[in-house]
């Protein structure tokens, strides 16, 4: 019945908390300045919402974490290409929309922000029940990296094909471009370096 969608399943209802966050993952090798620029752009977009009371941005350093962040290992998010935007909303009695409705609105609005290819922006809502690593998580195991990546790409494509699965991401990302310089000792001598 679940497979053919005759019976819809929702394990826990959406909660209506007074906080949300947006996690930012630029491609590995990106500078903290680039991460901060994206965080500031996200902050500019979300502060246009009347329900947002305050915003705090973090780039290249872990944001203060709550119980949800403890389980999601937020304290490890300290690389230059990682950022977070923490949002405090008006108390639920002072706003008409639920935090989930606000999160959906934010998700749509931040799609318009120009970001480098391979950047992931995820709107994170505190879960109504116990915290989890992700709402939906697939772990791929295999003999070698090439096989794992090929299978992961198929799983990711399957996730992306489902309309209600949002903020699809993977942990292998896009490899950072590398610059390799070969130094010629003859040239160094010639230019007196």
Report each predicted region and the residues it spans:
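Flexible glycine-/small-residue-rich
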Residues: 24-28, 57-59, 87-91, 123-125, ...
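Solvent-exposed, membrane-proximal periplasmic/extracellular interface segments of envelope transport
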Residues: 34-131, 186-193
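Flexible hinge/switch segments at interdomain interfaces of large molecular machines
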Residues: 11-18, 76-83, 117-135, 139, ...
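Beta-strand-rich non-transmembrane domains
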Residues: 144, 149-193
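Extended, hydrophobic alpha-helical segments in both membrane/secreted and soluble proteins
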Residues: 20-22, 39-42, 55, 155, ...
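A generic structural signal for alpha-helix starts
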Residues: 29-30, 93, 97, 143-147
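Interfacial helix-loop-helix hairpins and adjacent transmembrane helices
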Residues: 1, 28-34, 40
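Transmembrane helices with small-residue packing motifs
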Residues: 1-28, 70-72, 94, 135
